[in-house]
Each structure stands twice: as structure tokens, then as C-alpha cells.
Amino acid sequence: MANKKILVVGSANMDLSMNMYKVPDVGETLIDDGGVAYVPGGKGANAAVALTKLGADCHFCAKVGADLHGQKLYQYYKEFGINTSYLKVDREHPTGLAVVMKESDGNNRIIVYPGANGNLTVENINEAFECEPDALYLGFEIPFAIALSAAKIAASRGIPIFVDAAPAGKDYPLESLPMVEIFSPNEKETETFTGILPQGTDSALRAALALYKRVKAKYIVIKQGERGAFVYDGKHFFVIPSIRIGKAIDTTAAGDAFTAALTVEYLRSNNIRNAVKFGVAAGAITVTRKGASASIPTDDEVRALILKEDLI
């Protein structure tokens, strides 16, 4: 089967990644030599890298600044084989920057400065659809109005839509989104959208029901980290448990890898259970490696883990 062409409309950031024993408390100054580095990131870009590594023909629509970070990101995407025909340059705003603070237990806190990401336009989106994609992959690190425009264009053309619902905003009019194939937030994003933190099966079901009332989706897939993933289709639910293959080093791109892998496998198999297992396996590998997009596994690596764990 030919590789599916997936259009990613999302963010492109340079990440300032800082490793530390713990983040400082209010009023506290810490000295920590855990290491600091600039690495490619952004949820849209991470997804584009993941989709490409997992076998998709990925076209990336995003905006970077006319600066050194933008130049480095462009070259990085080209080297990965991502189609950058719709990667635009903003000459008035810098490339987006994310400050990623990673604690020794693998957990992280992220602050994003949108920069050029906030200036992606409807015209940019319309041009990107000239690639005639098989699917649209959306994230919310760009203005919600632009994400909504992309979704409406896709819906008008009968193109399936996959939403990695991050980051979340309480005021996002989710009801205005057209029908999407999969809507996938993590636990904290689900809490922001619904007021319910899905930490167990009962609370996850209540949260999924609340989301289902707001979002027109074939499937709600809640990423639950160490608990795996919770899936609801409006009538039934199931849980795919997580896989632990080693110490969690960096969770930065785990959600991006999960949703990208879920999307690729769903488009290949049209089987939601197998697709979620594929996503869980991709996320399990990702957290054992440092970095954002650099930590994302290949299709072969994910399939090898699935065979080893007898998941499918």
C-alpha cells in the first residue's frame, strides 16, 4: 500500500531544553549542571517528524522566523524528508521558542513563546491543501481560529481529520469543529476542556462523555501516560495499558509520538484498537530517549516492540 499523504498544520519551535534535578520553587534559585541545549521541537514539527519516521508522506504547513533558528529548523525538516513546500517565513516575528524544563524523574514543564506560529494565515492553509492530502493532522499550538479553518477546509473536501488537542484552552469553541476522526487530548488537557481529571476508568469515562458532547468525533482517545490510553466511541470504551521498556528519561514528545503513530496505523488498518496499541508502543519507546523529535522511533522499531510484547 502506498504511503498515505498527511498534511500537518501546526507549530514549529526551537526548544531550549534544560535538564535539572527539580524545578525551583517560587522565590528559589537553583544551580544545576544537568545540561542545556537547543533542539528542534514544536508539537506540529514533532508530529511531522514522527509521521515521516513512521512511513507517511508528510507535508508540513507552519511558519518560522527569518532567523538562525528558522534556518536550522528548515534544514532539519529537509534532512528528515518532510515536504517543506508550505513552510512559510515570517519576517516580522521570530521563530517560536519553547522552554522545556526536564526533571530527573523524566517529567517536564513547558512554556511556549509562539512567535511566528501565531501568524500562520488562512491563505497559507489554503495553499497547503494544494498537495491533496489523504488526511489532515492538527494541533493547537497555532491560533485556534487557524486550526478551525484548516479543519473546515478538510471537511469540505471529505478529508479525515486527526486532532492532537494540545495545548488546551478553556475558551476554545470545540463545538465549532467539524466532524473529526480522532480527537486526542492528554489528562491535563482533558481536565482543561471538561473540568474532569481522568485518572481512573470511571473518571476517564465521565471525561470522555463530556468531551463527546462538545466534540463531533468518531473516537475520543485520552492519553493517560503510565496508565495507557482510554478510547470512547459514543457507545463503548476500552483501555489499552501502557508498556514499560526502561526508565523514563524524557516525556517531552511522548504524546506527539503517540498521536502520530495512532494516526499512521489507523489510516493503514482502519482498526482503532490496533492503532492505539501502535501509539502506545511508540510512546513507550520515545520516553526512554532524550530530546523531542530526536526521541521518536521509526516504524520498524515500533513494530519490533509490538511483536516482542505480543500486542497485535
Outline where the language-model segments fall.
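Glycine-rich phosphate/adenosyl-contacting loop at the front of the ribokinase-like
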Residues: 1-63, 68-72, 78-79, 247-248
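Conserved phosphate-binding/catalytic region of the ribokinase-like
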Residues: 6, 170, 201-312
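Structural detector of well-ordered beta-strand residues that form the stable sheet scaffold
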Residues: 7, 59, 137, 162-164, ...
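Conserved N-terminal subdomain of the carbohydrate kinase-like
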Residues: 28-31, 38, 53-134, 303-312
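Alpha-helix C-terminal capping segments
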Residues: 48-57, 102, 264-269
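A generic structural signal for short hydrophobic patches within well-formed alpha-helices
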Residues: 125, 190-191, 229, 302
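Structural alpha-helical scaffold elements that stabilize or flank donor/cofactor-binding regions
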Residues: 128-130, 173-176, 213
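Conserved beta-alpha-beta core of the PfkB/ribokinase-like small-molecule kinase fold
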Residues: 135-206, 227-228
